Amino acid sequence: MYIEDIIIDGFKSYANRTVIEGFDPTFNAITGLNGSGKSNILDSICFVLGISNLSQVRVDSLQELVYKKGQAGITKASVTITFNNSDKKQSPAGYEHLDKITVTRQVAIGGRNKYLINGHNAQLSRVQDLFHSVQLNVNNPHFLIMQGRITKVLNMKPPEILAMIEEAAGTRMFEMKKNSALNTIEKKQKKVDEITKVLAEEITPTLDKLRGERTSYMKFTNNQTLIDRLQRFIIAYEYYTYEKKLESSEFESFKAEIDKGQKRKKDLTLKSTDLKAKISELAKQREKETNLEEMDQQEQKLSKELVKYQTSHKHQKESLDKEEGAINNLANTREEIKQSIQQKQKEKQSMEKKIQSIVEENQQINAELKTLQNKHNTMTTGISTGADGSSAAEDGSYTEQLMEAKKTAVNAASEYKQAEFRVKHLQSELIAKRKAITQEQTDHKKLQAEQELVEREIQQLTRSIQELQLDNSKQQELTEKKRQLEPLVSKLREEVGNASAQLSGLEFNYTDPSKSFDRSKVKGIVANLITLKDVETATALEICASGKLYNIVIEDDETGKALLSKGQLKRRVTLLPLNKVEGRSIDPQKIKNAQKIAPNGAVKPAIEFVEYDKELQPAMNFVFGSTFIATDKKYAQKAAFDSSIKVRTISLEGDEYNPAGSLTGGSRPPSGSILTQIQRLNENNRCLRENQSQLEHINFELVQLKSVTDRFKQLEQQLNIKQHAASLIAQRFQLNPHHQLLESIKEMEKSIESDTQLITNSMIKEKEALEKVKQLESQVNDFQSIRESQLKDLEKKIQITKEKCIKSNKIVKGEQVFIEKLDLEIQEMDNELENLSKETQGNQGTISKMRKDVDTLARSISETNKQIQDIRETLSEIRKDMAQKNDAIRSLHQELEKIQSEITEIDMSTEKLKSRMNRVDKDRQEASKWLEAAIKKHTWIKNEKQLFNRPGSDFDFNATDPSKANSEYIKLQEEQEKLSKTINRKVMSMFEKAEQEYQELMEKKKIIENDKSKIEHVIRELDEKKNESLRTTWKKVNKDFGSIFSTLLPGTSAKLEPPEGQNELFGLEVKVAFGDVWKETLSELSGGQKSLLALSLILSLLLFKPAPMYILDEIDAALDLSHTQNIGMMLKQHFTSSQFIVVSLKEGMFTNANVLFETKFIDGVSKVHRTVFNKKDKQVGKKK
């Protein structure tokens, strides 16, 4: 099958209907300038073949295939290809009867897309099947070779080259089928898994459950037979026992024992009366004695008073000692203050003398300043000039300056000499005072030690107070808390009392059945043992529990028996022993189903809404375990009546939905839910316990802190006293001779330092004055020339003198201020002396009063001691006498108790015997009635009565223990009762059906697994055949590959071989030889040589299974003319049965073609011209 002609209309650059006819069956070439439309011819062929990847035809949408996208008035693109089908061997499947096949594809603006085969509409799938059957798959186009594909082949890895061989061999289809088969296996495996899952999750559990039910059913039938046999045995034993009771003689023996006991009781009663009379007489004699209890109380009272007096006396004595010490300290302080006043007055007088000399010095400085200012004025004003040119006044002025300078030098010398004398005198006096201070050091050290001691005591007291400060603050805080808690506890106690009164029915009162009874085994009423997680569920939970809310939870059945028999219960109760009660719970699957129909926890088991101790789990399951609670009536109704759930459900409003079909609801008690009230009572009880415990703890801490508080106050008082003592010591320091000597030494050291500085300054002053004398003497004859400089010097001196004057004025004022300060200090000391005198007078009165109190307390202590001694002597005598009488009474009481105990035992024995007599009599009557009733009810007794208790018979009571038989009977009855509730009476038929389903599924599973095994076996066989076919293909392609490459590039050879260390099934790589030398890599090849190598490989693959048509699009673009010509020759030589359509721009390629089509672009439209090459290379042209 090959192309005969192509009709293009409105497709891409072919605006008008263009018929391209006369295609050669073997070799056709298309050439033309770039953009002339040569590649559009190839695009039109791909378009008809049904290409889906439009990027290969260089457009993004079908509308772009229309000429100028329909903007030039052409709205449809159509391509028709006529195929010659005369060679029936290459004919598509189903078209062997046709010699020509016409395929048309049209696309219009707006998206209409249409296919026609021989003028008839066809689906895309039909068109694709037509071309696929002759290896023309345009969406996987091996027949279409483009330059880009050649480039890809150069970069392929060994597995990718192997994949091309597989494609050529056709084993790719096998891989697809293999993958499909593997998918089938996977599906079958999923089916097996589903069957396994159904077996594991549904059938097997159901079968196991039915097996268990079948076992239970068979056990039920066997138990029933055994129960019937045991029942006859037990009835026979009871009949035998009752007969023996009728023949018993216990009644007479009991009566004889009673008479004997009554006689003994009469004798003991007479003896008891005599003992009571003796005890009464002794008690009267003891009561006549002095009242011992009153005397004991009086002794205790006096002892307390004595301790009180002794404590007060001690405290008063200590306070008196302190006050007397304080008076002595005040006297010492007054004396020290008087000495300080005298010292200050002396210091004032000394300062007044000192300031007088300073004032005189100040006046001298002022006079010097005035003289300098006058001299300055004289020099500034000037005097008339004499014949020699000098001024007499100025001469006189210089003379005055000269005299003044000499005077200054003399004064300065006098000053430093006087200062040297004073320094010498002060130094000698300083030595003397330092000796004196050493002598006074003892008293000073003593005073200093006293001050350090007081300061240490102050520090110690301060630390103690700081340590107790926290406790003092804590006491205030605790007192405030106590004030807040007391009314709160009182209020809570009242609320708990009122609530307890309203809920008095929820109390369980009983008497201990025995002395060793453990009350912890009685857990309490159910309502008191739970805590609600949500108060809103209270009504629903109360409806759920109903009467069980008031049941009593106990640890075991033995506790229950003890309570019922000996607990003296005042009302009828229901007990729930934890070891016996059967907890019921909802099936987990039903809970899951409920959660599906009511999302977000709208339906939950009632037990999830309460909190309780884990040990109470069985009882809580019994009360709440089998009911749902729903947040909404809608969900409650669904949970109750849904076929997959059917569980009793209660809404939050209290409406009950029963799966049996009943609905219960209505009004609620106005007092509210009992559970809510209990919850509130429990919460109040908890708060009361917490607050009461907190209050008790606070009271306890306050009691402990009371002593701490007293200690804190005492320490504060002591600290104040010590601080006052410290201030007095400080004042004594000021008046101490040692201290005064220290101050005097400091003043003398200052004076020495000042005079030393004065000596230095005076010597400098003298030196400056002498220099000035020399200078004035040299300047007298030349006054006019230096007048200006002298004026400046004079002004400078005036400035210095002014500063001295100001400084002197400040010193005078400072000294005057110091004298005023001394006056104030003297006045303050006088005031303090007056205050101390007043304080001393006040303390004298206090001491006098305290001495009287101490004496009074001492007398009280003496008198109280005497009273206590008298009372103790009297008490000793009375106690001795009473001890004797008490011993006698105690002895008589012991004897009386023995008699009373024996009488009680006789009474109890008599009561027991009477009870047993009554019981025996009653038993006889009951036995007679029971025997009569048993014979009527069980007719078999008459016939088998002679066998009762006969050895070897079914009623051998010695061989079979009746009590064990009875226990076994009760146990079987209980077991039978449980089984009757749970057994499935249809289990036998259900088990057979389930087992049949199980066998069927197992058979299906076996079949599927066999099918899977067969498919896997076939795949293994086909894998072997595929590998064989692949090897055959490889050899054929390898041969053609070398032949084609040798044709394209003479003198070379090429082959495909596996990578080193691997076989051909893992991959193939290309090897090239130039001459006889094989190259290790392809890197030595030029670009053109690599392109020829890749093209050779592609063509060798195509040659293995030739398609009817091949399209080559500019594959020679990278090749020179010689190689291009070789390609044309190779195509003619190797591809004789396929049609080639080659697009090329090189003459070496298309000169080998039989038909050449040239494209041109004229007036915006592509045109085609056909040229036929004959064997003599003559051209025949025809324009289309």
Swiss-Prot record:
The keyword Glycosyltransferase does not apply. GO terms for biological process: cell division; mitotic chromosome condensation. The keyword Endoplasmic reticulum does not apply. Pfam families: SMC_hinge (PF06470), SMC_N (PF02463). ATP binds at residues 32-39. It is found in: Nucleus. GO terms for cellular component: chromatin; condensed chromosome; condensin complex; nucleus. InterPro entries: P-loop_NTPase (IPR027417), RecF/RecN/SMC_N (IPR003395), SMC (IPR024704), Smc2_ABC (IPR027120), SMC_hinge (IPR010935), SMC_hinge_sf (IPR036277). Residues 520-639 form the SMC hinge domain. Transmembrane segments: none annotated. GO terms for molecular function: ATP binding; ATP hydrolysis activity; chromatin binding. Keywords: ATP-binding, Cell cycle, Cell division, Coiled coil, DNA condensation, Mitosis, Nucleotide-binding, Nucleus. It comes from the Eukaryota. Central component of the condensin complex, a complex required for conversion of interphase chromatin into mitotic-like condense chromosomes. The condensin complex probably introduces positive supercoils into relaxed DNA in the presence of type I topoisomerases and converts nicked DNA into positive knotted forms in the presence of type II topoisomerases. The SMC hinge domain, which separates the large intramolecular coiled coil regions, allows the heterodimerization with smc4 forming a V-shaped heterodimer. Forms a heterodimer with smc4. Component of the condensin complex, which contains the smc2-smc4 heterodimer. Belongs to the SMC family. SMC2 subfamily. This is Structural maintenance of chromosomes protein 2. The gene is smc2.
